[in-house]
Amino acid sequence: MIEVWAPRVERVRLRRPGLDDVAMVAAGDGWWRADVALADGDEYGFVLGEGDDLRPDPRSRRQPHGVHEASAWFDAASFSWTDVAWTGRQLAGGLIYELHLGTFTPEGTLDAAIARFDHLIDIGVTHIELLPVNAFNGTHNW
């Protein structure tokens, strides 16, 4: 089951690359639902109204191609955790860097940001706080 809140449209479709669009069903209070199972990594998005533009999932946990592109389904339960003994890092005395993924690199992706983490370590950063990754009005989502 996948849901999206789109209160001001008369029609919502779920779009996945290489597959036919799936008409979503109005579920009340602006919510739309589709009884579709997505596997970890499946790309998808929504088409609102009579348009044809793909919109990312505003509740997505993964945007591999940037905030304006298709979302990718993330199944946290399928991940095999191997670090149960890790206790985290001490916050006291740490240096926190507030990172906005959309502007930290030209690509605006987490993968591109990770490639620059060594620089943050070199300047003394001990913790990274991701700024909100959900969409806001404007070009850069702020």
Language model: regions and residue ranges:
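The feature marks proteins involved in alpha-glucan
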Residues: 1, 21, 27-98, 103-108, ...
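Short beta-strand elements bearing conserved aromatic residues within extracellular beta-rich modules
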Residues: 12-14, 44
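Residues that line or immediately flank small-molecule/substrate-binding pockets and catalytic motifs
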Residues: 16, 103, 132
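Amphipathic, non-transmembrane alpha-helical secondary structure
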Residues: 111-121
